[in-house]
Amino acid sequence: MFDQQRDGNLYKIWNRLCSGTWFPPPVLKKRIPKSNGKERILGIPTVSDRIAQGAIKLFMEEKLDPIFHADSYGYRPGKSAHDALKQCAIRCWRYSWILEVDISAFFDHVRHDLVLKALEHHGMPKWVILYCRRWMEAPMQSCENGELITRTRGTPQGGVISPLLANLFLHYAFDLWMEREYRGYRLRGTLMIL
């Protein structure tokens, strides 16, 4: 449907982003079963909102990615799980222990105020901060009954910009502390200290 009027739809996104009038529609709440029998909740944005998030993410990533720890591999351009495993192979010979930690429902608990404060700290323009706030606060709509759920924490797992915001949060909440205390790295929501 989006593609049938692609040029007009892209123009609307561009126009609204430039004028400050882009308001993200609710993200679709979708339950995905996990291998352990539990569920992961995804917040799936509309096609238009994914495009808008992608445009802002490209702008932000150029400025934020260079500040992230060299051993932070999750959701980073030019870095992968394979790169993290290579570092594990190199470092596992130097240490006799590994600590693995899984941050339960991490994307659901990211504090908005701390992400916005970090964006301000890095000199992100006010319009970027405005849109990041709107995306984090966008309601979630249940696909089962259409109920709208207000969100005061978290960033939708499934959003284009969410991994970058999560990495920024973890940069301050975890990576800088780890850098002072240990040599380590982070891979998505799983932490391994070597």
Language-model features: locations:
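Non-catalytic, polymerase-adjacent accessory regions of viral genome-replication enzymes
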Residues: 1-7
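Metal-dependent nuclease catalytic cores that hydrolyze phosphodiester bonds in DNA/RNA
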Residues: 2, 65, 97
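Conserved polymerase palm-domain catalytic core
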Residues: 12, 16-20, 24-31, 35, ...
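Exposed loop/turn and edge beta-strand positions of beta-sandwich/beta-sheet ligand-binding modules
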Residues: 38
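Conserved phosphate-binding loops in nucleotide/dinucleotide-binding enzymes
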Residues: 41-42, 46
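Duplex nucleic acid-engaging cores and interfaces of nucleic-acid transaction enzymes
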Residues: 47-57, 89
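Short, low-complexity, polar/charged sequence segments that are solvent-exposed and flexible
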Residues: 49-52, 61-63, 94, 117-121
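Charged boundary/loop elements
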Residues: 58-71
